[in-house]
Amino acid sequence: MKLRGLYAITDSQLLAGRFLTHVEAALEGGVRLLQYRDKSDDAARRLREAQALQKLCERYGTELVINDDAELAARLGVGVHLGQTDGPLTPARALLGRQAIIGSTCHASLDLAAQAASEGASYVAFGRFFNSVTKPGAPAADVGLLAQARGQVKLPIAVIGGITLDNAAPLVAHGADLLAVIHGLFGADSAQEVTRRARAFNALFAS
């Protein structure tokens, strides 16, 4: 399974009132990986929304991962993305099986990436690369890290943090496999603009 292209991440506040329409618009433009990210404690709504996203992803051939909730991922039979505060990846791999996509937040640390690889990660995520609305205090990373990671970590590399169409191209040029985008995709005013942005992000991988 090749993980390369646009990695769309949902934001429940940003997408309030237009959640499924804007997500489907992104999928229409081409999304390799979709992460359902919701930090609320409304388990019933989270299950409902995740199930709706799963149906959309199946329709468009997109892989779905759940943020920070391996149990919900297991219930749906999808992947999971874990941060550094979520514990080791090994239990999630045991729960979800060998084929599941499991991603790991590595901030700007090659050591964390190596550890994630040893614990069975499917991809590693570095960032923030630019000022981020979602995680303004996250450790900063730069393109030099990508060159080092390419030589040391034999996994797909996701990049995150303030990524827009104006700043994404150098990240792809320096070895990023997945552009993880929230506001730069879903901050659009219309569903049509979301689709246009998704296509434009994917075009960066074709050049």
UniProtKB/Swiss-Prot annotation:
**EC identifiers of the protein:** 2.5.1.3
Residues forming coiled coils: none
Q: Which residues bind 4-amino-2-methyl-5-(diphosphooxymethyl)pyrimidine?
A: 35-39, 67, 105, 135
One Pfam family recorded for the sequence: TMP-TENI
Question: What does the record's cofactor remark say about binding?
Answer: Binds 1 Mg(2+) ion per subunit.
So which cofactors does this thing need?
Mg(2+)
Q: Which reaction does it catalyse?
A: 2-[(2R,5Z)-2-carboxy-4-methylthiazol-5(2H)-ylidene]ethyl phosphate + 4-amino-2-methyl-5-(diphosphooxymethyl)pyrimidine + 2 H(+) = thiamine phosphate + CO2 + diphosphate; 2-(2-carboxy-4-methylthiazol-5-yl)ethyl phosphate + 4-amino-2-methyl-5-(diphosphooxymethyl)pyrimidine + 2 H(+) = thiamine phosphate + CO2 + diphosphate; 4-methyl-5-(2-phosphooxyethyl)-thiazole + 4-amino-2-methyl-5-(diphosphooxymethyl)pyrimidine + H(+) = thiamine phosphate + diphosphate
Pathway the protein acts in: Cofactor biosynthesis; thiamine diphosphate biosynthesis; thiamine phosphate from 4-amino-2-methyl-5-diphosphomethylpyrimidine and 4-methyl-5-(2-phosphoethyl)-thiazole: step 1/1
Which molecular function terms from Gene Ontology are attached?
Answer: magnesium ion binding; thiamine-phosphate diphosphorylase activity
Q: Which residues bind Mg(2+)?
A: 68, 86
- Gene Ontology CC annotations of this record: cytoplasm
* Residues bound to 2-[(2R,5Z)-2-carboxy-4-methylthiazol-5(2H)-ylidene]ethyl phosphate: 132-134, 162
What family does this chain come from, according to its entry?
Answer: Belongs to the thiamine-phosphate synthase family.
Q: Give the HAMAP family listed for this entry.
A: TMP_synthase (MF_00097)
Q: What does this protein do?
A: Condenses 4-methyl-5-(beta-hydroxyethyl)thiazole monophosphate (THZ-P) and 2-methyl-4-amino-5-hydroxymethyl pyrimidine pyrophosphate (HMP-PP) to form thiamine monophosphate (TMP).
Q: What is this protein called?
A: Thiamine-phosphate synthase
Report the source organism.
Answer: Pseudomonas putida (strain W619)
Q: What is the lineage of its organism?
A: Bacteria, Pseudomonadati, Pseudomonadota, Gammaproteobacteria, Pseudomonadales
Name of the gene this protein is made from: thiE
